[in-house]
Amino acid sequence: MVQAVRCAASSLFLLAVVGNGTAQSNYQVVSLGSPGTIAGTVKWSGPLPRIPTFSINKDPEICDPESHKIRDLERLIVGPQGGVANTVVFLKNISSGKAINLPEPRRFLDQKHCRYEPHILLVAQDAELRIKSSDATLHTVHMDGAATYNLPFPFTNQIVSRTMPTAGLANVRCNGGHAWMNAEILVVPHPYYTVTDESGRFQLTDVPPGQYEIVAWHEGWKVVRQEAAFDVLTQRRIQRPIFSDPRIWEKKVAVGENQTAVINFVLGDK
């Protein structure tokens, strides 16, 4: 059941990326004469839902240096002015433009204090993802969806690299007994993707002039149930949170030469 839910979420993201066609391996890098920019915000509207926390029941001296004994699942981060962080904003079905060059911090996954940093990653299709563990405990990165890996990290500062050949959504969890750990990796077929900052702001630069569909994608914040699982490495039964499907919003945007188009998205718990 868990695998089916995650595969469905990956399919939803892939559909948003490529529409009804095939993955955009035919994206072409072209010279840009007078490109434009798309900028805007993603903001929350209405009361904030109650976001459940998770008890830290393994390696508290490593996972819980502040002794809070609970961990925020980091699924919905809303700033004081209502900006929603960790929302992926991208152009749908763009066929040509600038070369892909995603920021380095978004291509490197660290396991630190038993959480994944960053929580949302962008990795170019066919590029290399590097994964590190800064923790002095056993973590096992379990990945499914667009990529399927099960990678143990028994040593501190160990780095493992894997190529990500398939566009889509890869769910990341820990199979080392830290059931609250979760992250999402978006393997992207072109460079016009970004992730909102802590204020909910985003910007896409060097966009060829034209008409586009722009998508805001959020991983979803509701825990629909807890599911019992057996952790092979720790030989323990654990409870894993199972999350609701991602949320997707779409708009149309016109980009002019040397112009900035402003697009804002509003999210809510409906």
Task: Locate predicted features.
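Sec/Tat signal peptide C-region and signal peptidase I cleavage site
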Residues: 19-23
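Extracytoplasmic copper-binding redox domains, predominantly the cupredoxin/blue-copper superfamily
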Residues: 24-270
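Bacterial N-terminal signal peptides
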Residues: 8-17
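Bacterial N-terminal signal peptides that target proteins for export
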Residues: 1-9
